[in-house]
Structure formats: C-alpha cells, structure tokens
C-alpha cells in the first residue's frame, strides 16, 4: 500500500469509497455519524484543492481516503470529560474511509499520518465501534469528548510520540 495526495481525477473513486463507508457504518450500528450524504462533494473537492485529501492505493487502485493536515482544529480547542495528552502542535485526521477490499487499510493510513507528525488527534462517533477498535489497536488514547461544528459529540483520541 502507498499514500499519495488525492487529485480531482480520484473524485469518482473517492465518492464510491464514501458511499461504501456510509453503507458499512449504517449496517454496523452507526447510521447517524455520516448519514446518507456526508461528506458532501464540495467538501471533498475543497479538501483536494487544499492538498489535504489523501488516498491509499494498492496495485494502483484507490482503496481508502482521508483528510490529513498539520493544523489546529477549532473543534479540538475545548475538550470535555478529560484532557489532551499534550499541548504541542499536532496533525489531524478526518473523514477516513476504505472500500473494504484490503484488510488493514485504515490502520495503514493512520500509521502513515502519525509518521508525518508524531502527535496526532482524531475523533469518532460513539456508535463507531469499528473505528474505536482500530484506534485502540494503534495505541491511540481516549482523551475525552469534543463537539463538532454542528454540536454533536465525538470521542476524542490522541497518539503522541513515546520519546
């Protein structure tokens, strides 16, 4: 597997992956996190234009997609029922999804993102047990709860370099 920055030529593949992910989430007890329309096409296109959309390829085929940036995420400013592991600059991952054809694609993407910054934050819905399991296996620590821009709560995770 390899990671590269997404281009607009990847849009059809990305849309298929997100459609698969929404269906998978709904069938695994998490129908509300992304509903039937998230992420919207204009958000995906914006991520691509800004250089923050990444794809994971296997045998020259796009199998996963995610948002990665080294930035302060406004929704991570306030954390409830806990604390972040540190106050150092961090990378963030959002909107990670795979097409389900290659086992471990999400873990590969998250490991790549961590290798870029060594201090990574991510959040997920309380019903997204699959992602919670992936994050636990990769030694992300549950830090508390954050609120998204629409006010819904998410479980906040962080992984920091052990040095």
Feature map (PLM): residue ranges:
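Conserved GNAT acetyl-CoA-binding A-motif
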Residues: 116-127
């Amino acid at each position: 597997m390899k990671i590269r920055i997404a281009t607009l030529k990847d849009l059809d593949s990305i849309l298929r992956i997100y459609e698969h992910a929404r269906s998978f989430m709904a069938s695994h007890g998490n129908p509300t996190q992304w509903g039937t329309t998230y992420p919207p096409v204009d958000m995906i296109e914006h991520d691509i234009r800004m250089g923050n959309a990444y794809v994971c390829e296997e045998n020259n085929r796009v199998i996963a997609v995610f948002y990665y940036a080294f930035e302060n995420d406004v929704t991570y400013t306030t954390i409830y029922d806990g604390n972040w592991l540190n106050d150092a600059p961090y990378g963030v991952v959002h909107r990670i999804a795979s097409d389900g054809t290659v086992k471990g694609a999400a873990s590969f993407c998250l490991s790549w993102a961590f290798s870029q910054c060594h201090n990574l934050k991510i959040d997920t819905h309380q019903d997204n047990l699959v992602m919670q399991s992936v994050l636990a296996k990769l030694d992300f620590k549950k830090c508390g709860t954050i609120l998204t821009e629409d006010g819904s709560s998410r479980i906040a995770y962080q992984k920091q370099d052990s040095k």
